[in-house]
């Protein structure tokens, strides 16, 4: 795969992963061209083979034969970009911090999207808001008839996918509780640190930003929750949108000798919520079960088995196993009593 500037991608402002990647490109000073619209439609028009699945954003790279290849999945794309554009790195050079960043990025992408997707498609006012805005973000000149048709179509499609994130009547109170907890931790964290792992942004920051860009700037219900509980998080989202003027330094990362108290609390939240669901999902997948349940913070979490997150768990373990023994032990020491250690076996 040939990666060269300007980077071309297809996205939608209502997509957390589009916002994640565009903000990262801005920070890294990587020229880009974004096509606002539906990847499906663009790829069909241009006879480009579709990735599986087709997602926002879809990146367009050249292969060795100079044919355009459509690529999705933000985490590996970031690593490819970092290998080509090495300045202003979002990946810590310290191997211990690099793993911690990977784990937080995965949490932001995979658990954070449960908040976003749940709030967007749970209450009528949020459903109406998303059903209207998402088609208009792709094409603001739709006729009212076209908009009505696309609104109904997208709402039906997305409401049929809420099982992916585990959003249902049983889990709704727990999702709400977890969301309020993590933003309360972020409120405390941003008193002392401008970013998750110090004074410069990591790829984990952009993962958190992607989901929060929607929770703050798109969906009415979570925005009202953040306004009441964490104005620092709201301000952080506004700032992280464009960090092109930030001048990072190699000393801006936190130390790997001891985690700041608020960072440890974030990992405790990861360990209490994301970790048990990942382990149960893996167990169900390996047993051929279509659904599973787990106890999270004293409540039952129930959802259908999600094969992609089995891959996510494997990749986390691969990252951990790539560390030398002493760094593996340092990670385990830093994560002691967070319950995150459970996924590293």
What is the role of each PLM region?
Residues 122, 126-176:
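Divalent-metal (Mg2+/Mn2+/Ca2+)-assisted nucleotide/phosphate chemistry catalytic cores
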Residues 1-146, 196, 216-217, 269-345:
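GST-like domain detector, emphasizing the conserved glutathione-binding G-site
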């Amino acid at each position: 795969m040939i990666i060269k500037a300007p980077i071309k991608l297809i996205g939608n402002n209502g997509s957390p992963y589009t916002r994640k990647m565009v903000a990262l490109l801005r920070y890294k000073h990587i020229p880009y061209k974004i096509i606002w619209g539906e990847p499906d439609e663009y790829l069909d028009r241009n006879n480009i083979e579709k990735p599986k699945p087709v997602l926002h954003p879809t990146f367009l790279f050249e292969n060795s034969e100079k044919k355009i290849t459509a690529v999705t999945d933000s985490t590996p794309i970031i690593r490819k970009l970092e290998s080509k554009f090495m300045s202003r790195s979002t990946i810590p050079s310290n191997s211990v911090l690099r793993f911690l960043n990977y784990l937080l990025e995965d949490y932001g992408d995979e658990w954070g999207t449960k908040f976003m997707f749940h709030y967007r498609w749970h209450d009528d006012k949020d459903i109406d808001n998303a059903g209207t805005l998402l088609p208009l973000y792709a094409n603001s000149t739709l006729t009212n008839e076209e908009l009505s048709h696309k609104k109904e179509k997208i709402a039906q499609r997305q409401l049929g996918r809420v099982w992916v994130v585990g959003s249902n009547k049983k889990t709704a109170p727990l999702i709400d509780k977890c969301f309020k907890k993590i933003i309360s931790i972020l409120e405390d964290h941003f008193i002392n640190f401008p970013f998750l792992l110090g004074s410069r942004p990591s790829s984990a920051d952009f993962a958190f930003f992607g989901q929060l860009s929607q929770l703050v700037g798109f969906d009415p219900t979570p925005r009202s929750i953040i306004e009441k509980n964490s104005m620092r998080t709201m301000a952080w989202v506004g700032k992280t949108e464009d960090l092109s003027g930030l001048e990072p330094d190699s000393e801006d990362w936190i130390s790997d000798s001891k985690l700041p108290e608020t960072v440890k609390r974030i990992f405790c939240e990861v360990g209490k919520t994301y970790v048990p669901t990942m382990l149960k999902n893996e167990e169900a997948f390996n047993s051929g079960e279509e659904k599973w349940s787990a106890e999270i913070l004293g409540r039952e979490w129930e959802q259908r088995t999600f094969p992609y997150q089995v891959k996510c768990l494997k990749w986390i373990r691969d990252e951990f196993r790539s560390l030398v023994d002493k760094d593996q032990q340092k990670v385990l020491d830093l994560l002691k009593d967070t319950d995150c250690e459970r996924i590293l076996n």
